[in-house]
Amino acid sequence: MGPPPSLYTHAVGPRSRLISAVAAAAIVLVALAAPARATEYFVAPGGVGNGSGSFPFGRIQDALDAARPGDVITAAPGTYAESLSSVRGGSPDAPITLRAAVARTAIVTRASRILTVSHAYLVVDGLVLDGQYAPDDTVRVTSSGNFLVLRNTEVRRSSRDLIDMAAPVGVLIEGSLLHHALNAAGGRTDAHGIVAGAVRDLTIRDTEIHTFSGDGVQVDPDRAAPGWDRVTIEGSKIWLAPLPGPENGFAAGAVPGENAVDTKAAPTNTRSRITVRDTVASGFRGGFINNMAAFNFKEYVDATVDGVTVFDSEIAFRLRGPATGALVLLRNAVVYNVTTAFRYEDNIQNLRLWNSTVGLNVSRAFQAASAPKATLDVRNLLSIPALSAEASSASNLRANASSFVDASAHDYHLVAASPAVDGGERLDDVTIDRDGLARPQGSGYDVGAYERAPTTARGQAPATGPAGTR
């Protein structure tokens, strides 16, 4: 069962669907490889038994105390007023799995931390973890909580962070809903959706994060050695909106958060790498801070941003130097309904903005801040706002609404008569568009985030696979 519908919907792109399908197949293989002697423990509210199907435990923690590698804990629908801690780890081919019998119906809640993971190879699937706005993280993952899988799980209501990780390796957060990390102390205090230290190989996939007073995702506030690396965010949604009513000290109408993604990394560490693809961010405006941005890439990071959409925000991408600042490759982006699409600062170097579309209701495509010596490489940019000096390359084009299928509905696919069709230059690092269609489809690269597919005799674009195969 997938995540429940929310007020904010987004269709996962073909690349994310392919990645998710591969991941699902791997999960099946792991399940088949589980030891034949694995035990399934059952838990139900009010149970007083030994964990059997007919005589279940009453507490999930009792099952965690008993579980060994390969075992499965199944929690019946209901409310469990307890805090949970891992007791022992699983193994690569035999994780310990804690799952809800019916997704999102087993609710673990109390005014405290709800889950502490300090052992490797634990899978948490389909639970609701509710911290009741306690002054603690809802989920804490220590540096020993390697290869945690948090799948199809709702994590909510913290006055600190919803998920706080030290420096584990290989954590996967997938198909989950994280919301309401709010701390109104001092007017507004950081409470993040996900915050991580020197993590490695963290993946956040097909996950929705909203309503926080810090950042949706932040790495690493402590800038700890040896530094974080290989963080991936894909197929996800990160958003803010004015609060519909008073909430944990904030007034109705407040927009308490800062950024969808915020990076911090010490120049004495190895440069930290982050990839964000097929992800949507919105609502980053009208808050408590100046220069409110969806994506705030700064310090010693190497960021690849592909197929990202930003709207209803003050700044879509805030990109910050200097030479020891962010290295950024941004391609296949679509930006609309923002004040500034790209703000570049502090003499950022080697900023590459390729094959992206700046749509309607954007006050300015570029804004420089303390950046007289910044170096930008802007190519194949398609922009409804006027092109500025940053986009002086001949491959960049100004467009009007008639170049697109339906600009008023923010559908920025190209029509056949658009001057952007075959009007760009070849970029070897941009091999597909944001739909997964191979570039080029015609005699040359199209300008902007979308490649226009050739039409069949009936005037319909042919079906394409995730990499543009037919």
Segments predicted by a language model, with ranges:
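Right-handed parallel beta-helix/beta-spiral solenoid domain characteristic of secreted/periplasmic
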Residues: V72-P77, G89-T138, L182, A399-S402
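Detector for repetitive beta-architecture
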Residues: E40, G70-V72, P77, P95, ...
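Bacterial N-terminal signal peptides
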Residues: V22-A31
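Acidic Gly/Asp/Thr-rich repetitive segments characteristic of extracellular carbohydrate-active
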Residues: V43-E82, S418, D446
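Extracellular beta-strand/beta-solenoid scaffold signature
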Residues: S85, D93, T109-L115, Y133-T142, ...
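Feature marks extracellular polysaccharide-active and adherence modules
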Residues: A76, V87, R99-A101, S118, ...
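Predominantly extracellular beta-rich ligand-binding scaffolds that present long acidic/polar faces
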Residues: S83, V87-G89, D93, D278-A281, ...
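Surface beta-loop-beta hairpin patches that serve as ligand-binding interfaces in beta-rich domains
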Residues: S418-R470
